[in-house]
Regions:
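Active-site-proximal alpha-helix that buttresses catalytic centers in soluble enzyme cores
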Residues: 1-153
Length: 153
């Protein structure tokens, strides 16, 4: 079986301020996103950006979300469903977010249980950037480093 992991940047678990704050912290604490020493990044993100930006961002997320939830997430799920239908049973397609849910760790663990022969990782970004595509591939390698059986990538 061939696994296809579609990865988008991420979205908060809900449009309320605590969830948005959690999302911002996870996203902005990635050293590939804000490329400064950890201590300064931590002070900036946890002391300034997350506390002050989360309430404003939550209001915007509340306007974007609808009955299905986050458009970024449910449109991604729609793509997974359609791609799975097109590719058939020889493929196993999953959606993951680099930050938040559905998380890459769970998606890869699920894919590992399928005994994949090959894994195709497709970031949903229009071009390569260290902060996006680079972060996705780095996280995939980090999560797969202890796998006993490694699929072709």
């Amino acid at each position: 079986m061939i696994g296809v992991l579609l990865v988008n940047l991420g979205t908060p678990d809900n449009p309320k301020t605590p969830a948005v704050r959690k999302y911002l912290r996870e996203f902005l604490m990635d050293g590939r996103v804000i490329d400064i020493p950890y201590i300064f990044r931590s002070l900036l993100v946890n002391g300034i950006i997350a506390p002050f930006r989360a309430p404003k961002s939550a209001k915007i997320y509340q306007e974007l979300w609808d009955d299905r939830g986050s458009p970024l997430k449910y449109y991604g799920e729609d793509v997974v469903r359609d791609l799975q239908n097109k590719l058939g049973d020889a493929y196993y397609v999953r959606l993951a977010m680099r930050y938040q849910s559905p998380d890459m760790k769970s998606a890869l663990a699920d894919m590992q249980s399928k005994g994949l022969k090959k894994l195709i990782v497709i970031p949903f970004f229009p071009q390569y950037a260290s902060a996006t595509t680079g972060s996705v591939y780095e996280r995939v390698m980090e999560l797969m480093k202890d796998w006993q059986v490694m699929p072709d990538l």
